[in-house]
């Protein structure tokens, strides 16, 4: 199975993050990382199955106001308690229809490339100074993060932008190139911080580290000049034992230098 076929078979709600239930402890880490406080007005964009995040933001971190945004009405049936809870505001609108001008902390689960540029424009237009946007894995667009504890990324408004991908990688990872060891360590940290079950952790680390490195290779920001032996080995493991073929991900030929 080619990687695009593998992804196509994943339900879209999983890709968007809507149908993923995240451990409450992960949200506690995120809120501590973002320094959520009683002075903050918190918005969770596309909160999906994670009403628990809204509850924790209000009850444990005492956020001044809490808003859960979701554009799909059928999804809200899972959150009748929240809809009836006056301390938590549920808004059934698409993100682009919601006024974010009073938000001081925003959590956006996944950075959809197709929405990224539109969201950055919306944030630039509506957010007040010092508003914090928390994303996972990467900032929005070419925004330079204000703070990083991978996979948690915080960007503070007004945003500053990288002039090239290496500058952004330096800000996220602390170095201007990505080697396979770094990719593996980041994948391990993601699995640990997101508290992924041990049953799936090894597979997740292998696949994620490969995707991280291959994407860096295609962008010509790997530290290696050629495809290293571990990448070739894990490509074979994924193909042989998991029936996942990553060949189509390689846009560059292995003879091209970074």
Where are these regions (language model features)?
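Rossmann-like AdoMet/SAM-dependent catalytic core
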Residues: 172-258
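Conserved class I S-adenosyl-L-methionine
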Residues: 38-48
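Conserved SAM-binding motif I beta-strand of class I
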Residues: 65-70
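S-adenosyl-L-methionine
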Residues: 1-38, 73-101, 235, 250, 258
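Short SAM/SAH-binding signature in class I
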Residues: 100-113, 117
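Conserved SAM-binding loop of SAM-dependent methyltransferases across substrates and taxa
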Residues: 49-63
